[in-house]
Amino acid sequence: MPKLSKRLASLVTKIEDRAYQPLEAIQLVKENATAKFDETMEAHVRLGIDPKYTDQQLRTTVALPQGTGQTVRIAVITRGEKVAEAKAAGAELSGDEDLVEAISKGEMNFDLLIATPDMMPKVAKLGRVLGPRGLMPNPKAGTVTTDLASAIQEFKAGKLEFRADRTGIVHVRFGKASFTAEALLENLKTLQETIDRNKPSGAKGRYWKSLYVTSTMGPSVEVDIALLQDIEQEG
């Protein structure tokens, strides 16, 4: 087992081995986010699903009401007038065959790729490059669309895609340590509701196994899932 750094080991001693009330868990993570940069807040959710079965897979999007605190670089593969439309809407990169060619050579200076349906046959050929990085556009994720302006604005504002990995764990960033605890809780609650709303049809038994929140350099804190589900959001 790898040794913890002295800093992390000292922080871990402040955390009890129990599930915390949601706001308390977030406050504890914030207190332990002592790195010299604004650490990213992350949620790690273990679900009772086996993604090797298609009816137990989870892949969707969540629009975090308080945003992610991160700048998202968006590339758009389209053609004709929509190339300029994507640029005008805020995409860092937009193009047709030229962008497909650049990506095929490993040039990927972006965090999210959006494509119009007519370009998907060409984008599909990039599966070997995009697939392992989780960047392949997908209609379920809202990244295959003709409404480029809306999609770009939504992802810039805090919408993000997530999926359960092969072990049934979901990893989602839900803000920055500099956010207020209340803002982070609002984002976490929205994530919980999204995961519940998109429960795979084949999920059996206990759906939520565990939920931990952490920061980039800090220790993890377990969250009481039932208490999080009981919170009612305004609006």
Swiss-Prot record:
NCBIfam families: rplA_bact. The lineage of its organism: Bacteria, Bacillati, Cyanobacteriota, Cyanophyceae, Synechococcales. Belongs to the universal ribosomal protein uL1 family. GO terms for molecular function: rRNA binding; structural constituent of ribosome; tRNA binding. Part of the 50S ribosomal subunit. One of its GO terms (cellular component) is large ribosomal subunit. Keywords: Repressor, Ribonucleoprotein, Ribosomal protein, RNA-binding, rRNA-binding, Translation regulation, tRNA-binding. SUPFAM superfamilies: Ribosomal protein L1 (SSF56808). It holds the Pfam family Ribosomal_L1. InterPro entries: Ribosom_uL1_bac-type, Ribosomal_uL1, Ribosomal_uL1-like, Ribosomal_uL1/biogenesis, Ribosomal_uL1_3-a/b-sand, Ribosomal_uL1_CS. Binds directly to 23S rRNA. The L1 stalk is quite mobile in the ribosome, and is involved in E site tRNA release. This is Large ribosomal subunit protein uL1. It comes from Synechococcus sp. (strain CC9311). One of its GO terms (biological process) is regulation of translation.
